[in-house]
């Protein structure tokens, strides 16, 4: 089982889009060979709220498109097999204002950009990062592979 708790603080995300994001992340979970039951949250916020979160928790006083808080970060890997509890991956926070701007810049739909950002945040929850050039190449390559296999491409 894969549980995703959605929360929209903006009122801009259509109910049907939750299903697309859920399907994409379920696909990504399989692609990443996560067989355990898992749980995460996806919250949609505006620029003001994401800047406040970024400032408070990351010491970066600026707006961004997506922030992820991995619950397993810097923790030893835990074997959940045999336990009747889900693996709690963490929280993904997406700024709908920035998502709309990026969708316009890339020439694709707002819905599609939300999918890209949700997957990007999901990969962060799994430990991918882009702090170095090598890490960026690995993460973005993985992101593109999953998006292409799922059929959600830019443009």
UniProtKB/Swiss-Prot annotation:
Cofactors per UniProt?
Answer: Zn(2+)
What stretch or stretches form a coiled coil here?
Answer: none
What does the UniProt cofactor note say? Binds 1 zinc ion.
Biological process terms from the Gene Ontology for this record are: rRNA processing
**Superkingdom classification of source:** Bacteria
Localization in the cell: Cytoplasm
Main localization (coarse): cytoplasm
Looking at the keywords, is Metal-binding present? yes
- What keywords appear on the UniProt entry? Cytoplasm, Endonuclease, Hydrolase, Metal-binding, Nuclease, Ribosome biogenesis, rRNA processing, Zinc
Q: What Enzyme Commission number(s) appear in the record?
A: 3.1.-.-
A Gene Ontology molecular-function term?
zinc ion binding
> Could you tell me which Pfam families the record lists for this protein?
YbeY
Instruction: Quote the record's binding site residues for Zn(2+).
Output: 120, 124, 130
GO cellular component terms listed in the entry, alphabetical order:
cytoplasm
Q: Where are the transmembrane segments?
A: none
Record has Cytoplasm as a keyword? yes
Fetch the HAMAP family from UniProt: Endoribonucl_YbeY
Q: Provide the family line.
A: Belongs to the endoribonuclease YbeY family.
Q: What does this protein do?
A: Single strand-specific metallo-endoribonuclease involved in late-stage 70S ribosome quality control and in maturation of the 3' terminus of the 16S rRNA.
Q: What is this protein called?
A: Endoribonuclease YbeY
**UniProt organism field:** Staphylococcus aureus (strain MSSA476)
- Gene name, Swiss-Prot/TrEMBL: ybeY
């Amino acid at each position: 089982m894969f549980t995703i708790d959605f929360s929209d603080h903006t009122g801009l995300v259509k109910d049907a889009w939750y299903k697309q994001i859920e399907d994409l992340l379920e696909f990504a979970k399989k692609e990443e060979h996560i067989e355990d039951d898992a749980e995460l949250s996806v919250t949609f916020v505006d620029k003001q709220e994401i800047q406040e979160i970024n400032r408070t928790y990351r010491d970066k006083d600026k707006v961004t498109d997506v922030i992820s808080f991995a619950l397993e970060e810097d923790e030893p890997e835990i074997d959940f097999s045999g336990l009747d509890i889900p693996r709690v991956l963490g929280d993904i926070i997406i700024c709908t204002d920035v998502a709309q701007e990026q969708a316009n810049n890339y020439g694709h739909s707002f819905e599609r950009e939300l999918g890209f950002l949700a997957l990007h945040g999901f990969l962060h929850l799994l430990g991918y990062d882009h702090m170095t050039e090598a890490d960026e190449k690995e993460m973005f390559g993985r992101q593109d592979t999953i998006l292409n296999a799922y059929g959600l491409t830019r443009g």
